[in-house]
Amino acid sequence: MRILDYCRALSQTSLVALLAFAGISSASGVDLKVKRVQLDNGLTVLLHENTQSPTVACRLFYATGSVHEKQGSTGLAHMLEHMLFKGTQKVGITDSVQDGKFLAQEDNLQKLIRGAEVKGDTLSLKGYKARHDSILEEHRKLFVKDELWEAYLKAGGTGLNAYTTDLVTAYFVTLPRNKVELFFWLESDRMQNAVLREFYPERDVVREERRMRYDDSPTGRYFETLEATFYEAFPYRNPTIGYPSEIMHLTREKAAEHYRKYYKPNNAILVLAGDFKADSLMPLIQKYFATVPRGEDFEPITQQEPEQVGEKRLVVRRSDSKPRVDILFHTPGVPNPDLFALDIMESVLNGRAGRLYRRLVEKEQVAVSTDAGNAVKKYYSSFELEAILQEGQTPEKAEALLWEELERLKKEPVSERELQKVRNQLYASKASALADMESVASMLAYYEIYGDYTLVNRWLEEVSKVTPAQVQAVAQKYFQKKLQTVGWFIPAEK
């Protein structure tokens, strides 16, 4: 598993992986027919018709994630994702008026609880918490538990879920073609009428999720710290789930502010891929979404990652470690022509037939597995290498062998035969992938957020143009020891 994939989940997808979702019509490019419409309120709609299955993959992506969080509020975007399943003014509640009164009481008690915690007033704290729990218990009598989930399931929905990355918060489900209107109704309602019920109990759930995935995981803190080492200033350094102390200081008020700012049609992308006629669906999309008010335009992210001035190293020792070596390099964000050559290098190095596996696993028997990834993103990207060590092998040797393969890319042009083999692999992966409408829908949403969904129809052509000389030049440009960030996760010293 790639390091940044671990820490940022789905956000760290390479161009190769993203475009493996798409089919190809020829050896020169992808031919994905997409209709793009933008409503007057700014909502972007992408529609791809495919009749192979009587279903429609539905996606609603908001261009907001951990990079948009204020200092001291890491985990807020992820927390809000959880809250969007608690219902709206119409969904999940039997009495919206009483609902509002209970929420106000709970918010007031939380302020008293925070004040007592600051003062160290344990007696008052105990009383406030008991009162809060009592009010919440009464409040829950008004809830219609999991009403949104049940509505989708009763309509034949599958794959209902959501996720948060550093760049997006995504909500998705696949529905029978005659039930897509339900998606429009529920999601347009969530876009403007969400009610953040049970915020503080859910905050405890998220804190426990963090403990299991990071704090108690042998590699969790290592990956988190490595990423914070790799990024000096840009908010990609922060974990999407948030830091423990900051999670526990998130408030319903902060989450509501984030919701009101970013959950707006002009910051959202609606994608449908499957069995429908675009001309028939557009009136329904207009009906449910066109009346949602446009949000205020907010300032783009201006924070920049400073140029790396020297090699960085992180060594983490644990008694329960599975030894590994990771090397990371900064690369440009989308769009940049160097990314196509880096995609080629990923394929040259990666896989059981790739150079890293053949060298470190089969020949030298230093590692049990290897990986290489061109982790492409908006703003900044990274190229990553990893080796999971054989028992008794040293990180010094593994790192040296990884560097020998990088130096080989820098000094020796990739042969035309090897380059054509990589191209053939990429062509083959595209030829069958168009069958997955769920992946096609997600791919289109990501590329639109990256700035241009049409890249899916140009990527293969661009990769086909990459020459051995270009691969060599790009390798020389980015793979420098003074620009590397190295991580060792090794056993504790006895």
Language-model features: locations:
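N-terminal secretory signal peptides that target proteins for export/translocation
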Residues: 1-9
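Proteolytic maturation boundary segments
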Residues: 4, 25-47, 269, 277-317, ...
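Bacterial N-terminal signal peptides
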Residues: 11-23
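M16 family metallopeptidases and their MPP-like homologs
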Residues: 48, 53-69, 76-77, 93-189, ...
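Active-site recognition of the HExxH zinc-binding catalytic motif
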Residues: 74-86
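An aromatic/glycine/proline-enriched structural segment found at the starts
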Residues: 190-198, 207, 211-215, 230-241, ...
